[in-house]
């Protein structure tokens, strides 16, 4: 399959959330598998999740494999898994400084939703809850994750359409 052009939608109406969407030239079932299968997720997201699975109510951890971020542990709590509709987890946004203990901070909620458009899958991601992140690092977390989600939406699109 070939990839269709990316349709990105950005909402900056709130400092509390990041929203991104992309149209992927693949069926919902294929995009869902790339999201909900932990090993496939790791393949496009850049995290070592071999042998792991995403189950609602459970924590999942794996080492980031993106150059320059190998010291970071991807640490998420799986909130909801609604097959071919919604996948969500909580995490500490842009928690990359090994000298900082982020465990006492609130988390943000990352929600992926999928919609069949008849021409492919509209995949949307919303990360919300930034208003609860400590002020000292909130703007950097929003800035870095905004760029991160733009890249990750391209990554999943490329992964799904070339695998």
Predicted regions and their residues:
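Short, solvent-exposed aromatic-acidic interface loops
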Residues: 92-97, 126-133
